[in-house]
Amino acid sequence: MAIFYDDPLERLNQPIKTKSYRKKQVVQRVHVFIFDNWKLILLGILNLIFLIIAIVFAILFFVGSADCAQLPDYTTSPASQLTTSAISSRTSEVQTNAITTTQGTPSNKTSTTTPSTSKVICASGFTLVGTKCGKLVSSNQPRTEADSICKGYGGSTLFSVRNEQETRDMLDFVKDSNIDFLWTGLVCNQTARTSCIWDVKSGTTADYNNFADGFPNVVYGYCIYFIVTGNSAGQWGSEQCSQLMNFVCELPTTIRDPDCKYNYNKNCYIRFDITLTIPQAQRFCNEKGADLVSIHSANENRFILTIYDIHGQILLGGLAPAVDFIVWLDGSPTTYSNLLYFYDTRSCVLMTVARGGPYDGDWYTMNCNVQEFFLCKRAIDF
């Protein structure tokens, strides 16, 4: 609404909205905005700081590794029982990539070998079951022992069922085996169906379950079995983990590579029992067309443990500027972490290998000048 002044002097006495006044209003609005949104602004600043730290850390790390341009003469470990795994060394090896890819009954000793033109394979002794590889073990074992036996087969786990198709695939796989029940890789510590967890924390039953009526039931037990025969075939029940049952071990498919001893999930792992620092080991692996190993699942972590028969540590190709922040040297994203021991002043990541003992598979940070055995990893070309 317009304001009229009877006296011209009164008009002159009114405050004039100068540029400084408008600037003051802008400052006030900015102040109010910051006050109302300070949490979001602080979160953004922290994320930016973490990003800058990671970039600076990576730059300093590789600049510091320049002193390693001339690598020392590599000496093998004094542990005489260890065998140096060079890429070209394949004599007297078990060929883990001799496989079968046709679905067949596990009770039948014969199997159809894939033609040489097929590259998608299963490890030796495993059969293609849908999109995964399975090995039926016709030996009644308590659940813990069954899991241990599976681990001995290339780090495999007790089988999982994540959808209806996988249920049908498993029933077809064991239909002629004369088996009624199988241990699965599922454990339920509560009665709620969504509370169950697959082995090595590889998922839950939140998206799919096929429990029979009244299950899971912790009164019967925490371990889950798969029903093979009868009207309830394909459904799941609960049982004491000490109960004896047959079981199926599971591995992912991979790609044929006759030059690879340790072949898992379309990657080749090359073990070197020589002691280097992480910068030196990364350069060494690069010269072999690979990278220092990165790990992206609990299943992969489990597989790597089967490569080693020692008590000690191996280098991983990771840097940890923060407990929940790992940068892999091969540039792959961080989708999994088993970093249990983090030290602020130590940023290079190592893994304990202890042949099933305490801390087996645990990760921890250490000074980057420490020298240990290491594992290279390269993708297998399809």
UniProtKB/Swiss-Prot annotation:
Residues 100-116 have a biased composition (Low complexity). Disruption phenotype: Suppresses motor neuron dorsal guidance defects in an unc-6 mutant background. Mild shorter and stouter phenotype. Expressed in ventral cord motor neurons and PLM touch neurons. Disulfide bonds join C150-C249, C223-C241, C285-C376, C348-C368. Keywords: Disulfide bond, Glycoprotein, Lectin, Membrane, Repeat, Signal-anchor, Transmembrane, Transmembrane helix. The chain crosses the membrane at residues 41-61. Its main location: membrane. Coiled coil: none annotated. This is C-type lectin domain-containing protein 38. It comes from Caenorhabditis elegans. The gene is clec-38.
